[in-house]
Amino acid sequence: MLSAALRRRVLAPTHSALRTGFAAHVVRHYASFPEHQVIKMPALSPTMQAGNIGAWQKKPGDSIAPGDVLVEIETDKAQMDFEFQEEGVIAKILKDAGEKDIPVGSPIAVLVEEGTDISAFEKFSIEDAGGDAAKPAAPKKEEKSESKSESASAPEPTPEPQQYQSQGRLQTALDRLPNISASAKRLAREKGISIDGLKGTGKNGQITEEDVKKAISSPAASSAPSATYEDIPISGMRKTIANRLVESTQTNPHFYVTSSISVSKLLKLRQALNSSADGKYKLSVNDFLIKAIAVASRKVPQVNSSWRDGNIRQFNNVDVSVAVSTPTGLITPIVTGVEGRGLEAISSQVKSLAKKARDGKLKPEEYQGGTISISNMGMNPAVDHFTAVINPPQAAILAVGTTKKVAIPAENEAGVEFDDQITLTASFDHKVVDGAVGAEWLKELKQVLENPLELLL
């Protein structure tokens, strides 16, 4: 019973992955408790070392059936669902919703057979489940030596690392925030009063509105008001974005090539195609750009490559990672096989992936990989042009600015006419792409965008 298998909406694992990986997350126990199984924090992505507990979909006493979602887990990549494929009853929740940085392998819940008395697990603890898994290795801090008077006494056991000493439980960043009521916090922010060091007179030492008022009236507060700020917790996705971009800027020697592209013909073609679509599709400028990237990459394949240990991998297919801004951060879903797709298919795929990204429902195979990227900020009229950071291990990314009306010479009475232009800036990894190759790729991109009928061939 309950050889539980893991299935996620975001990625259905292979049978071999279930056989080798899931067993580590469900452990059968007997001891002084009725027969039960400990459910542990699973590794829901290849790089996941710890996760945050989201909303529990089951509570103690609830039955769980095949395919039911047990709990939402935030990984270093996205919000994912943790599901079981067999039945049982939840006897105990060991990690509450909102708990953060729980190492993979740590106990999070207890599962029993139908009919088991779950009241027997009322006092079941993490220790009864074998304890939390070790956290990812961190630099060790030097221990301060004991005073001479203490060293003369009998030796004491080696103390645990400081980060685990918090009155018997792990102290999170949220635990270290000042204990302050909402009204007091609001008043302190309005009056520019620092709550650091304020002594609370409320229940359990909570800082009250009255405490803040006293601080406002004190001479120190009136003479030297301190700056106010708010510390915002960092999500798993934010950490991943930060780590990958730091890695990219430190290991990829970027160089940039910029060109102004006339898109007047492209805009007219787009308007004509959309007008004749009868609502079946609505093409965007970005759809044309994605297709143009594939055309240029087939003509200059060195750009559609990545740096690997000992070799440069040049891809035959063009899978374009499209940067999408979501409430939790930037993610790059992939339009695969762009070289073989038409504009309508590209448009449909981009819209579908963007919606999934904003809803947090992308599967890992929909955002992991890609051979080249595009980042479009053209919807913001203030952005003429910008440079983008390469998405490793790719070797190139195209940054797209907004469309501008530019006066150009013309053989008419005024001597000028206005042309719709976009400034494109390509970032290249110089380990993979030489300057002349990058320039050639941008030339091919310019050629096809300024003659957009070629995209229909």
From Swiss-Prot:
GO cellular component: mitochondrial matrix; mitochondrion; pyruvate dehydrogenase complex
Record-linked InterPro entries: 2-oxoA_DH_lipoyl-BS (IPR003016), 2-oxoacid_DH_actylTfrase (IPR001078), Biotin_lipoyl (IPR000089), CAT-like_dom_sf (IPR023213), E2/Pdx1 (IPR045257), E3-bd_dom_sf (IPR036625), LAT1 (IPR006257), PSBD (IPR004167)
N6-crotonyllysine: residues bearing it: 148
Chain intervals for the UniProt region annotation (Disordered): 129-168
Effect of residue 148 to R: Abolishes crotonylation. Decreases pyruvate dehydrogenase complex activity, cellular ATP content, and conidial germination
BP-aspect Gene Ontology terms: aerobic respiration; pyruvate decarboxylation to acetyl-CoA
Main location: mitochondrion
Active site: 430, 434
CDD domains: lipoyl_domain
Cofactor info, note text: Binds 1 lipoyl cofactor covalently.
Transmembrane residue ranges: none
Catalysis: reaction(s): N(6)-[(R)-dihydrolipoyl]-L-lysyl-[protein] + acetyl-CoA = N(6)-[(R)-S(8)-acetyldihydrolipoyl]-L-lysyl-[protein] + CoA
Post-translational modification: Decrotonylated at 'Lys-148' by SIR5, which inhibits the activity of the pyruvate dehydrogenase complex (PDC).
Residues covered by the Lipoyl-binding domain: 36-112
Effect caused by changing residue 148 to Q: Abolishes crotonylation. Increases pyruvate dehydrogenase complex activity, cellular ATP content, and conidial germination
Pfam families found in the cross-reference section: 2-oxoacid_dh (PF00198), Biotin_lipoyl (PF00364), E3_binding (PF02817)
UniProt EC number: 2.3.1.12
Comp. bias (Basic and acidic residues): 139-149
Location of this chain's protein in the cell: Mitochondrion matrix
Residues bearing PTM N6-lipoyllysine: 77
Biological role stated in the UniProt entry: The pyruvate dehydrogenase complex catalyzes the overall conversion of pyruvate to acetyl-CoA and CO(2). High pyruvate dehydrogenase complex activity is required for sufficient energy production during germination of conidia.
Subunit structure, interactors included: Eukaryotic pyruvate dehydrogenase (PDH) complexes are organized as a core consisting of the oligomeric dihydrolipoamide acetyl-transferase (E2), around which are arranged multiple copies of pyruvate dehydrogenase (E1), dihydrolipoamide dehydrogenase (E3) and protein X (E3BP) bound by non-covalent bonds. Interacts with SIR5; the interaction is direct.
Family: Belongs to the 2-oxoacid dehydrogenase family.
Remarks, miscellaneous: The E2 component contains covalently-bound lipoyl cofactors and it participates in the generation of acetyl groups from hydroxyethyl-thiamine pyrophosphate-E1 and their transfer to coenzyme A.
Name assigned to this protein: Dihydrolipoyllysine-residue acetyltransferase component of pyruvate dehydrogenase complex, mitochondrial
Gene source species: Fusarium oxysporum f. sp. lycopersici (strain 4287 / CBS 123668 / FGSC 9935 / NRRL 34936) (Fusarium vascular wilt of tomato)
